[in-house]
Structures are given as structure tokens and as C-alpha cells.
């Protein structure tokens, strides 16, 4: 009985430390990203993912970092992870669509735009931008 109470007390004492470490890494990553310290920010977001593997925002920021570092494969991989975790993440769908347009992948871009139209709430104004870029791709 005493062993159980001791275990419960330890868990209660250690749990808040892991939760604060988790948000601490993400917040540090945001600050570093805003200061364009991409390598350091990347490390902080990866640390956040270790503590919270379903942190869609960490994956989203990693994709933005890889975009800035011109690592398109890693950008796409992280955007796909965000969409896997949250299929209604507008920003991830928007960024993945832009990436596919830049890669001249017409069919994927078209599917993503249609998906974007269905779930759009905050970034609906960006749909016109996507459609015009897709039309430019079509005329090439």
C-alpha cells in the first residue's frame, strides 16, 4: 500500500516537469524561428516532438524551417505529417499545395486545392492565389 502511494506521489511530482519542458521547447523554438535562427529552432522543435510526438505545430514549423533551408523533401515530409495528425490544418494544406505547384505537380495541386476549399475557414482568401498559380502552371 505504501509503495503504491509512493509511486503515485512520484508520478504526480514528475508529470508537471515533463509538461512544462514540453511547452518550453516549443516556445523557445518559436522565439528562435522569429529571430531566423533556423538550426537552433529546428533542434527545439525536434525536442518538443520527442516529448509530444503529436505536436502538429512543431511539425508545421519544421516544414517552414526546411522551406527556408531549401530542403523540399523534408518540408513535404513534415507537411504530410501535419496533415496526417490534423487533416483540417488549413495552413499545412496551403503550404503543401504551394510546394506541389512549385514542383509542377498539377494533379496533386488540384486535389489539395479542392480539399482546401472544403475545409477552409480562416485562409479562404488564399484560395484565389492558389488557383491563379495553378492556372499559371497549366499554361506552361
Named regions from a protein language model:
Residues 34-35, 68-69, 102, 133-140:
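Register position in tetratricopeptide repeats
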Residues 61, 95, 129-133:
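Canonical tetratricopeptide repeat
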Residues 110-140:
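Terminal, low-structured helical/coil segments at or just beyond the last alpha-helical repeat
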Residues 48, 81-82, 115-116:
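Canonical positions in the second alpha-helix
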Amino acid at each position: 500500500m505504501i509503495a503504491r502511494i509512493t509511486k503515485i506521489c512520484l508520478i504526480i511530482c514528475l508529470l508537471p516537469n515533463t509538461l512544462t519542458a514540453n511547452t518550453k521547447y516549443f516556445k523557445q523554438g518559436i522565439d528562435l524561428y522569429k529571430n531566423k535562427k533556423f538550426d537552433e529552432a529546428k533542434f527545439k522543435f525536434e525536442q518538443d516532438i520527442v516529448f509530444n510526438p503529436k505536436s502538429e505545430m512543431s511539425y508545421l514549423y519544421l516544414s517552414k524551417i526546411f522551406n527556408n533551408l531549401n530542403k523540399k523533401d523534408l518540408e513535404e515530409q513534415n507537411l504530410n505529417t501535419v496533415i496526417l495528425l490534423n487533416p483540417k490544418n488549413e495552413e499545412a494544406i496551403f503550404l503543401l499545395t504551394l510546394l506541389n505547384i512549385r514542383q509542377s505537380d498539377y494533379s496533386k495541386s488540384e486535389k489539395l486545392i479542392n480539399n482546401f476549399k472544403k475545409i477552409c475557414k480562416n485562409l479562404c482568401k488564399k484560395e484565389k492565389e492558389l488557383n491563379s498559380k495553378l492556372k499559371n502552371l497549366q499554361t506552361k
